[in-house]
Curated annotation (Swiss-Prot):
Its main location: cytoplasm. Belongs to the RecF family. It holds the Pfam family SMC_N. PROSITE patterns: RECF_1, RECF_2. This is DNA replication and repair protein RecF. It comes from the Bacteria.
Amino acid sequence: MALTRLLIKDFRNIEAADLALVPGFNFLVGANGSGKTSVLEAIYTLGHGRAFRSIQAGRVIRHDQPEFVLHGRIDGTETERSVGLSKNRQGDSKVRIDGSDGHKVAELAQLLPIQLITPEGFTLLNGGPKFRRAFLDWGCFHNEPGFFAAWSNMKRLLRQRNAALRQVSHYGQLRAWDQELVPLAERISEWRAQYSAAIANDIATTCTQFLPEFSLSFSFQRGWDKESEYAELLERQFERDRMLGYTALGPHKADFRIRASGVAVEDMLSRGQLKLLMCALRLAQGEFLTRQNGLRCLYLIDDFASELDSTRRRLLAERLKATHAQVFVSAVSAEQIEDMVGEKGKMFRVEQGKITVQSQD
């Protein structure tokens, strides 16, 4: 699977661009602020319905324009698909797939699985549990057909339950919500646990290649006491939840922890080592998807050289090459990506939102 063509209109500082892409490495080289990250963000937005640097649509639409428009052509193993997304300043989205309107953003995500590696990506390791839940949920979304519907319903029921907690006086008034919430919560927790167990070997293998000096362990925490039934816990915790005004325990509090020799990795590893670990997690997840479903991820790597010395850059370059996936890499200079440049690569020069093809000679 590869994105063979990308059209960008009024996205960030890019007025218009029509890019012919290659299945291997696509390099975006330019000074800071030139727009190279905007290209990566456009691809990410086409696959997720939102940008990774801002959740507000108005901030990614070019100045004085009413909307942004993105189109892509995806070359799969047997078919070619066309996808499109537009979003106005009010946040209203239109999704088009193969020429027809009325599709959902989740359908884009299914067609265009993306792994993102940015300088801010350390939050996967040292940020709050929501970032690691998102990591697990990405995997469940692509491996369990019913996950997205169950996850969406669970989020809706939790919002309704939290609103009701501020109004009710006894648990019986919440029972109807919990009768729907509990089976969804248990199913989602089971899917997450199964996925974290299934991918653990992939993560361990990749981490051994990247960080052989550490003995890493992984553990999934479902968000409530593993000895307790969730239905009983919700009833038992009612008074506490009512005082708090929200549901304190459940799958929305799940986490996936990584330790090095028993110590949280964020407390032991250097920033360069944390970046390698983050890359290892993303690569392992992408390779697991390929093995399970035959789909290859797109890898988006912003500011490739950040936090990595030349030895670590070469290591990451070799591992990315081994995936045979499509990779998009941004860098300030061509020298920073010389270990990746090869006959299957294509280089783009980005200057003030203008994108041109640059010879690699």
